[in-house]
Amino acid sequence: LTASQELPEGCKVTSTENHGISFWAQTGRIDVRLLDGTPQSFFIKVLSKELGMNMTRAEFHSMSAMHNVLPEFVPRPIACGTYRTMADTHFFLCEFREMTDDMPDPHKFAALLSTLHQKSVSPTGKFGFHITTYAGNLPQFVAWEDSWEAFFAKSMRQALDLEIERKGPSEELDVLSRVLFEKVIPRLLRPLESDGRVVKPSLVHGDLWYANAGSDVDSDQPLVFDACCFFAHNECTFSYETLAVTHA
């Protein structure tokens, strides 16, 4: 398999160029001319090794899940795969959408995000996702869980374990984490699923901040990309966006 095999049959590649910025991948634009003479463009992301393969698969499945629910909100994913002549090199391919550098219109953006959360349905009725997704190059906890409290707690535990693995043990972190898991999370989240209350597992982008959103140049339609999805409480990733904007 090669990326060129996933392009429209009979098309001619007219140009390729680097496009976009990524900490983890090479990213580019592919321009082609279709058999009828119509120009068309594609975006490609290339990563290496086993982690790169897992990340390209995760992005394809994430973007496909969002596109299936709300196709106008994301560039159409096309394929992911491994290069035939470079077995350790992997790609994610989607349609190319020219975007402005401005933030999307907040009212249009919020309306689309709300629609995504409301229309999406977890295939298992649980919180999680069917394939491990990655926030940057870090794997997220996505195992299926019946309870939002349980899912969130295990997600936080995995994040803390990764922190300890990278930076070493911390007595202060141990003290804080015990309070977090024994008191804070149960007190804040358990009432959401008590006395008949329920939390709907909604499809969330997973890494929603200003650098992963834009507006289509032609339609001014808000778009999001670089998704690392899972089914969660619909507000769970808003704190990530606020933190990113605050420290930008």
Predicted regions and their residues:
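Active-site activation/catalytic loop segments of kinase-like enzymes and analogous catalytic loops
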Residues: 162, 229-248
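Conserved N-terminal boundary motif of the eukaryotic protein kinase catalytic domain
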Residues: 9-18
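An alpha-helical support segment within catalytic cores of ATP-dependent transferases
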Residues: 2-7, 82-85, 121-205, 216-219
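Hydrophobic "anchor" residues on beta-strands that sit immediately upstream
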Residues: 41, 91, 201-203, 222
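ATP-binding pocket architecture of kinase catalytic cores
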Residues: 17-150, 154
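Activation segment
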Residues: 99, 222, 228-230
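Hydrophobic HxD+1 residue recognition
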Residues: 208
